[in-house]
Swiss-Prot record:
Matching SUPFAM superfamilies: Terpenoid synthases
Gene3D superfamilies in UniProt: Farnesyl Diphosphate Synthase
Pfam families for this protein: polyprenyl_synt
Keyword flag Magnesium: yes
InterPro entries linked to this entry: Isoprenoid_synthase_dom_sf (IPR008949), Polyprenyl_synt (IPR000092)
Protein name, per record: Prenyltransferase ltmC
Residues engaged in binding Mg(2+) 1: 119, 123
GO molecular function annotation: metal ion binding; prenyltransferase activity
Cofactor annotation: Mg(2+)
Species lineage: Eukaryota, Fungi, Dikarya, Ascomycota, Pezizomycotina
Binding site for Mg(2+) 2: 119, 123
Function: Prenyltransferase; part of the gene cluster that mediates the biosynthesis of lolitrems, indole-diterpene mycotoxins that are potent tremorgens in mammals, and are synthesized by clavicipitaceous fungal endophytes in association with their grass hosts. The geranylgeranyl diphosphate (GGPP) synthase ltmG is proposed to catalyze the first step in lolitrem biosynthesis. LtmG catalyzes a series of iterative condensations of isopentenyl diphosphate (IPP) with dimethylallyl diphosphate (DMAPP), geranyl diphosphate (GPP), and farnesyl diphosphate (FPP), to form GGPP.
GO BP terms: alcohol biosynthetic process; isoprenoid biosynthetic process; mycotoxin biosynthetic process
Protein backbone atom coordinates (compact mmCIF):
# COMPACT_ATOMS: atom_id res chain seq x y z
CA UNK A 1 0.00 0.00 0.00
CA UNK A 2 1.40 3.43 -0.97
CA UNK A 3 1.77 6.17 1.62
CA UNK A 4 -0.97 8.13 -0.12
CA UNK A 5 -3.35 5.20 0.03
CA UNK A 6 -2.50 4.66 3.70
CA UNK A 7 -3.29 8.29 4.51
CA UNK A 8 -6.63 7.92 2.78
CA UNK A 9 -7.39 4.63 4.52
CA UNK A 10 -6.11 5.70 7.95
CA UNK A 11 -9.29 7.55 9.06
CA UNK A 12 -11.40 4.57 8.07
CA UNK A 13 -9.07 2.26 10.00
CA UNK A 14 -9.34 4.48 13.06
CA UNK A 15 -13.14 4.47 12.78
CA UNK A 16 -13.18 0.69 12.46
CA UNK A 17 -10.87 0.37 15.48
CA UNK A 18 -13.12 2.72 17.44
CA UNK A 19 -16.17 0.71 16.45
CA UNK A 20 -14.48 -2.53 17.47
CA UNK A 21 -13.50 -1.01 20.83
CA UNK A 22 -17.00 0.27 21.39
CA UNK A 23 -18.45 -3.10 20.41
CA UNK A 24 -16.06 -4.91 22.77
CA UNK A 25 -16.82 -2.53 25.63
CA UNK A 26 -20.53 -2.81 24.96
CA UNK A 27 -20.27 -6.59 24.85
CA UNK A 28 -18.44 -6.67 28.18
CA UNK A 29 -21.00 -4.39 29.81
CA UNK A 30 -23.86 -6.35 28.28
CA UNK A 31 -22.25 -9.64 29.30
CA UNK A 32 -21.87 -8.41 32.88
CA UNK A 33 -25.48 -7.22 32.98
CA UNK A 34 -26.67 -10.42 31.33
CA UNK A 35 -24.66 -12.49 33.80
CA UNK A 36 -26.23 -10.64 36.71
CA UNK A 37 -29.61 -11.10 35.06
CA UNK A 38 -28.96 -14.83 34.64
CA UNK A 39 -28.04 -15.12 38.33
CA UNK A 40 -31.20 -13.25 39.27
CA UNK A 41 -33.29 -15.45 36.98
CA UNK A 42 -31.69 -18.57 38.43
CA UNK A 43 -32.73 -17.47 41.92
CA UNK A 44 -36.24 -16.73 40.66
CA UNK A 45 -36.54 -20.15 39.05
CA UNK A 46 -34.54 -22.34 41.41
CA UNK A 47 -34.42 -20.39 44.68
CA UNK A 48 -31.62 -19.63 47.10
CA UNK A 49 -31.34 -23.26 48.15
CA UNK A 50 -33.24 -24.11 51.29
CA UNK A 51 -30.40 -26.27 52.65
CA UNK A 52 -28.31 -23.13 53.15
CA UNK A 53 -31.11 -21.15 54.77
CA UNK A 54 -32.29 -21.26 58.35
CA UNK A 55 -35.27 -19.53 59.93
CA UNK A 56 -35.58 -19.30 63.67
CA UNK A 57 -38.82 -20.76 64.92
CA UNK A 58 -39.65 -22.58 61.68
CA UNK A 59 -39.30 -26.27 60.99
CA UNK A 60 -38.00 -27.38 64.36
CA UNK A 61 -35.36 -26.50 66.93
CA UNK A 62 -32.47 -26.79 64.46
CA UNK A 63 -33.90 -23.88 62.44
CA UNK A 64 -33.94 -25.83 59.16
CA UNK A 65 -36.93 -25.11 57.00
CA UNK A 66 -39.25 -27.81 55.56
CA UNK A 67 -38.21 -29.64 52.42
CA UNK A 68 -41.16 -28.47 50.27
CA UNK A 69 -42.76 -25.06 49.60
CA UNK A 70 -46.23 -26.06 50.79
CA UNK A 71 -44.98 -27.34 54.15
CA UNK A 72 -43.00 -24.12 54.49
CA UNK A 73 -46.06 -21.92 53.93
CA UNK A 74 -48.07 -24.06 56.38
CA UNK A 75 -45.34 -23.45 58.94
CA UNK A 76 -45.94 -19.70 58.52
CA UNK A 77 -49.75 -19.82 58.77
CA UNK A 78 -50.24 -22.88 60.92
CA UNK A 79 -51.90 -26.17 60.00
CA UNK A 80 -55.72 -26.01 59.75
CA UNK A 81 -55.68 -22.24 59.32
CA UNK A 82 -59.48 -22.13 58.91
CA UNK A 83 -60.18 -24.13 62.08
CA UNK A 84 -61.47 -21.12 64.10
CA UNK A 85 -64.00 -20.25 61.37
CA UNK A 86 -65.06 -23.88 60.92
CA UNK A 87 -65.61 -24.34 64.66
CA UNK A 88 -67.49 -21.03 64.87
CA UNK A 89 -69.79 -21.82 61.94
CA UNK A 90 -70.31 -25.52 62.78
CA UNK A 91 -69.36 -26.16 66.44
CA UNK A 92 -70.37 -29.85 66.46
CA UNK A 93 -68.76 -30.93 63.18
CA UNK A 94 -65.46 -32.09 64.65
CA UNK A 95 -67.19 -34.30 67.22
CA UNK A 96 -69.92 -35.71 64.94
CA UNK A 97 -68.03 -36.08 61.66
CA UNK A 98 -64.27 -36.01 62.35
CA UNK A 99 -63.28 -37.28 58.88
CA UNK A 100 -65.35 -34.63 57.13
CA UNK A 101 -63.98 -31.99 59.52
CA UNK A 102 -60.42 -33.03 58.62
CA UNK A 103 -61.17 -33.05 54.88
CA UNK A 104 -62.72 -29.58 54.94
CA UNK A 105 -59.77 -28.11 56.81
CA UNK A 106 -57.31 -29.74 54.40
CA UNK A 107 -59.29 -28.43 51.40
CA UNK A 108 -59.32 -24.89 52.77
CA UNK A 109 -55.61 -25.01 53.61
CA UNK A 110 -54.80 -26.27 50.12
CA UNK A 111 -56.88 -23.68 48.26
CA UNK A 112 -55.87 -20.73 50.41
CA UNK A 113 -52.16 -21.47 50.77
CA UNK A 114 -51.55 -22.74 47.23
CA UNK A 115 -53.13 -19.59 45.82
CA UNK A 116 -50.89 -17.55 48.13
CA UNK A 117 -47.83 -19.41 46.83
CA UNK A 118 -48.71 -18.60 43.21
CA UNK A 119 -49.81 -15.05 44.09
CA UNK A 120 -46.42 -14.33 45.67
CA UNK A 121 -44.72 -15.48 42.46
CA UNK A 122 -46.94 -13.19 40.37
CA UNK A 123 -46.27 -10.23 42.67
CA UNK A 124 -42.53 -10.90 43.14
CA UNK A 125 -43.24 -10.63 46.85
CA UNK A 126 -40.09 -10.76 49.00
CA UNK A 127 -41.85 -11.58 52.27
CA UNK A 128 -44.87 -13.35 53.65
CA UNK A 129 -45.63 -12.87 57.36
CA UNK A 130 -42.19 -11.28 57.71
CA UNK A 131 -40.44 -14.40 56.37
CA UNK A 132 -38.88 -15.01 52.97
CA UNK A 133 -41.51 -16.06 50.44
CA UNK A 134 -41.52 -19.68 49.30
CA UNK A 135 -40.52 -19.01 45.69
CA UNK A 136 -37.33 -17.23 46.78
CA UNK A 137 -36.30 -20.27 48.81
CA UNK A 138 -37.43 -23.08 46.54
CA UNK A 139 -37.71 -21.25 43.20
CA UNK A 140 -40.81 -20.28 41.25
CA UNK A 141 -40.83 -23.53 39.26
CA UNK A 142 -40.96 -25.88 42.24
CA UNK A 143 -43.28 -23.58 44.20
CA UNK A 144 -45.86 -23.32 41.40
CA UNK A 145 -45.65 -27.04 40.62
CA UNK A 146 -46.08 -27.95 44.28
CA UNK A 147 -49.18 -25.74 44.46
CA UNK A 148 -50.73 -27.56 41.48
CA UNK A 149 -49.69 -30.93 42.92
CA UNK A 150 -51.24 -30.23 46.35
CA UNK A 151 -54.48 -28.97 44.80
CA UNK A 152 -54.71 -31.98 42.49
CA UNK A 153 -54.26 -34.36 45.41
CA UNK A 154 -56.91 -32.69 47.54
CA UNK A 155 -59.37 -32.63 44.61
CA UNK A 156 -58.80 -36.35 44.06
CA UNK A 157 -59.24 -37.06 47.77
CA UNK A 158 -62.45 -35.03 47.98
CA UNK A 159 -63.91 -36.79 44.93
CA UNK A 160 -63.27 -40.17 46.58
CA UNK A 161 -64.36 -39.34 50.15
CA UNK A 162 -67.10 -36.73 49.62
CA UNK A 163 -67.98 -36.27 45.91
CA UNK A 164 -70.34 -33.36 46.62
CA UNK A 165 -67.50 -31.49 48.30
CA UNK A 166 -65.20 -32.31 45.40
CA UNK A 167 -67.66 -30.76 42.95
CA UNK A 168 -67.96 -27.63 45.11
CA UNK A 169 -64.17 -27.41 45.28
CA UNK A 170 -63.82 -27.55 41.49
CA UNK A 171 -66.56 -24.96 41.04
CA UNK A 172 -64.88 -22.62 43.53
CA UNK A 173 -61.45 -22.99 41.95
CA UNK A 174 -62.88 -22.02 38.56
CA UNK A 175 -64.45 -18.85 39.99
CA UNK A 176 -61.39 -17.91 42.05
CA UNK A 177 -59.11 -18.31 39.04
CA UNK A 178 -61.54 -16.32 36.89
CA UNK A 179 -61.25 -13.44 39.35
CA UNK A 180 -57.48 -13.78 39.48
CA UNK A 181 -57.37 -13.79 35.68
CA UNK A 182 -59.34 -10.53 35.54
CA UNK A 183 -56.87 -8.94 37.95
CA UNK A 184 -53.84 -10.16 35.99
CA UNK A 185 -55.23 -8.93 32.66
CA UNK A 186 -55.79 -5.48 34.16
CA UNK A 187 -52.21 -5.52 35.40
CA UNK A 188 -50.82 -6.73 32.08
CA UNK A 189 -52.65 -4.20 29.92
CA UNK A 190 -52.61 -1.28 32.35
CA UNK A 191 -55.40 1.17 33.00
CA UNK A 192 -56.55 1.13 29.38
CA UNK A 193 -58.03 -2.32 30.04
CA UNK A 194 -59.99 -1.02 33.03
CA UNK A 195 -62.48 1.18 31.22
CA UNK A 196 -65.08 1.62 33.97
CA UNK A 197 -65.60 4.99 35.63
CA UNK A 198 -67.30 6.33 38.73
CA UNK A 199 -69.61 3.98 40.60
CA UNK A 200 -69.37 1.45 37.77
CA UNK A 201 -65.60 1.13 38.30
CA UNK A 202 -66.10 0.34 41.99
CA UNK A 203 -68.69 -2.31 41.12
CA UNK A 204 -66.39 -3.80 38.47
CA UNK A 205 -63.59 -4.09 41.01
CA UNK A 206 -65.97 -5.52 43.62
CA UNK A 207 -67.13 -8.18 41.14
CA UNK A 208 -63.52 -9.26 40.63
CA UNK A 209 -62.92 -9.33 44.40
CA UNK A 210 -66.06 -11.38 45.03
CA UNK A 211 -64.79 -13.94 42.54
CA UNK A 212 -61.20 -14.02 43.76
CA UNK A 213 -61.68 -13.69 47.51
CA UNK A 214 -65.40 -13.96 48.18
CA UNK A 215 -65.54 -17.39 46.58
CA UNK A 216 -62.92 -18.71 49.01
CA UNK A 217 -65.19 -18.04 51.98
CA UNK A 218 -68.35 -19.09 50.13
CA UNK A 219 -66.58 -22.39 49.46
CA UNK A 220 -66.17 -22.90 53.20
CA UNK A 221 -69.93 -22.51 53.70
CA UNK A 222 -70.70 -24.87 50.83
CA UNK A 223 -68.39 -27.51 52.30
CA UNK A 224 -69.92 -27.18 55.76
CA UNK A 225 -73.47 -27.32 54.36
CA UNK A 226 -72.87 -30.27 52.02
CA UNK A 227 -73.25 -28.06 48.94
CA UNK A 228 -76.07 -25.94 50.39
CA UNK A 229 -76.29 -22.22 49.55
CA UNK A 230 -77.61 -20.93 52.87
CA UNK A 231 -74.34 -19.25 53.91
CA UNK A 232 -73.47 -17.78 50.49
CA UNK A 233 -74.62 -14.23 51.21
CA UNK A 234 -73.03 -14.00 54.65
CA UNK A 235 -69.68 -15.46 53.62
CA UNK A 236 -69.64 -13.62 50.28
CA UNK A 237 -70.01 -10.35 52.17
CA UNK A 238 -67.27 -11.43 54.54
CA UNK A 239 -65.02 -12.23 51.58
CA UNK A 240 -65.57 -8.70 50.22
CA UNK A 241 -64.72 -7.30 53.66
CA UNK A 242 -61.54 -9.42 53.78
CA UNK A 243 -60.45 -8.14 50.35
CA UNK A 244 -61.15 -4.52 51.34
CA UNK A 245 -59.23 -5.01 54.57
CA UNK A 246 -56.26 -6.46 52.70
CA UNK A 247 -56.32 -3.63 50.13
CA UNK A 248 -56.46 -0.94 52.80
CA UNK A 249 -53.72 -2.50 54.91
CA UNK A 250 -51.52 -2.69 51.81
CA UNK A 251 -51.51 1.12 51.82
CA UNK A 252 -52.39 2.24 55.34
CA UNK A 253 -50.73 -0.29 57.67
CA UNK A 254 -47.04 0.04 58.53
CA UNK A 255 -47.17 -3.33 60.28
CA UNK A 256 -48.61 -5.00 57.17
CA UNK A 257 -45.94 -3.39 54.98
CA UNK A 258 -43.24 -4.63 57.36
CA UNK A 259 -44.58 -8.19 57.19
CA UNK A 260 -44.75 -8.02 53.38
CA UNK A 261 -41.33 -6.41 53.02
CA UNK A 262 -42.61 -3.51 50.91
CA UNK A 263 -44.97 -0.55 51.04
CA UNK A 264 -47.92 -0.42 48.61
CA UNK A 265 -47.00 -3.63 46.80
CA UNK A 266 -50.17 -3.43 44.66
CA UNK A 267 -49.24 0.01 43.36
CA UNK A 268 -45.67 -1.04 42.57
CA UNK A 269 -47.00 -4.02 40.61
CA UNK A 270 -49.49 -1.89 38.64
CA UNK A 271 -52.21 -3.94 40.30
CA UNK A 272 -55.63 -2.46 40.87
CA UNK A 273 -56.86 -2.30 44.45
CA UNK A 274 -59.82 -0.56 46.03
CA UNK A 275 -57.80 2.53 47.11
CA UNK A 276 -56.36 2.81 43.59
CA UNK A 277 -59.83 2.68 42.02
CA UNK A 278 -61.09 5.30 44.48
CA UNK A 279 -58.12 7.54 43.65
CA UNK A 280 -58.77 7.14 39.92
CA UNK A 281 -62.24 8.60 40.50
CA UNK A 282 -60.89 11.67 42.31
CA UNK A 283 -59.82 14.51 40.00
CA UNK A 284 -57.16 15.60 42.51
CA UNK A 285 -55.44 12.19 42.68
CA UNK A 286 -56.17 10.57 39.30
CA UNK A 287 -53.17 12.16 37.46
CA UNK A 288 -50.63 10.84 40.00
CA UNK A 289 -52.05 7.31 39.85
CA UNK A 290 -52.09 7.21 36.05
CA UNK A 291 -48.53 8.56 35.86
CA UNK A 292 -47.24 5.93 38.28
CA UNK A 293 -48.98 3.12 36.37
CA UNK A 294 -47.48 4.34 33.09
CA UNK A 295 -43.90 5.07 34.15
CA UNK A 296 -43.25 2.84 37.19
CA UNK A 297 -40.71 5.51 38.12
CA UNK A 298 -39.93 5.55 41.85
CA UNK A 299 -40.63 9.27 42.08
CA UNK A 300 -44.00 8.84 40.39
CA UNK A 301 -44.82 5.89 42.65
CA UNK A 302 -43.98 8.00 45.71
CA UNK A 303 -46.28 10.79 44.51
CA UNK A 304 -49.03 8.25 43.79
CA UNK A 305 -48.64 6.84 47.30
CA UNK A 306 -49.03 10.35 48.69
CA UNK A 307 -52.22 10.66 46.62
CA UNK A 308 -53.52 7.40 48.11
CA UNK A 309 -52.70 8.77 51.56
CA UNK A 310 -54.73 11.93 50.90
CA UNK A 311 -57.66 12.39 53.33
CA UNK A 312 -60.33 12.17 50.61
CA UNK A 313 -59.12 8.79 49.32
CA UNK A 314 -58.19 7.29 52.69
CA UNK A 315 -61.42 8.31 54.41
CA UNK A 316 -63.51 6.91 51.55
CA UNK A 317 -61.66 3.58 51.76
CA UNK A 318 -61.85 3.25 55.53
CA UNK A 319 -65.51 4.28 55.57
CA UNK A 320 -66.29 1.63 52.93
CA UNK A 321 -64.38 -0.95 55.00
CA UNK A 322 -66.31 -0.02 58.13
CA UNK A 323 -69.65 -0.25 56.31
CA UNK A 324 -68.71 -3.60 54.76
CA UNK A 325 -67.99 -5.01 58.22
CA UNK A 326 -71.39 -4.16 59.68
CA UNK A 327 -73.11 -7.32 60.87
CA UNK A 328 -69.90 -9.32 60.46
CA UNK A 329 -68.26 -8.40 63.76
CA UNK A 330 -68.16 -11.97 65.10
CA UNK A 331 -66.64 -13.35 61.90
CA UNK A 332 -64.10 -10.53 61.80
CA UNK A 333 -63.08 -11.26 65.40
CA UNK A 334 -62.73 -15.00 64.72
CA UNK A 335 -60.72 -14.43 61.52
CA UNK A 336 -58.40 -12.28 63.61
CA UNK A 337 -56.41 -10.03 61.28
CA UNK A 338 -54.59 -7.85 63.80
CA UNK A 339 -52.43 -5.45 61.74
CA UNK A 340 -53.22 -1.87 62.72
CA UNK A 341 -54.01 0.90 60.22
CA UNK A 342 -53.22 4.57 60.74
CA UNK A 343 -56.29 6.77 60.46
CA UNK A 344 -56.63 10.33 59.24
CA UNK A 345 -57.53 12.74 62.01
Amino acid sequence: MTSGAWLVARPAAIEIAALLFAFTLGYLVKYTINYQSVVSQAIDHYGYGYERTSHEGIGGSNGKIPDCPYSYVISLYGHNHFSPLVDFLHPTLKHKYPKKHSLILDIMDAVHLCLIMVDDICDHSPKRKNHTTAHLLYGSCETANRAYFVLTKVINRAMKEQPVLGIELLRALELILEGQDMSLVWRRDGLRSFESYGEESLLTYKNMALLKTGTLFVLLGRLLNQGGHQSDDLLGRFGWYAQLQNDCKNIYSEEYAFNKGTVAEDLRNRELSFPVVVALNDKHTEPQIRKAFQSQNQGDIKRALQALESPSVKNTCLKTLQEAGQGLENLVAVWGRKEQMHFTK
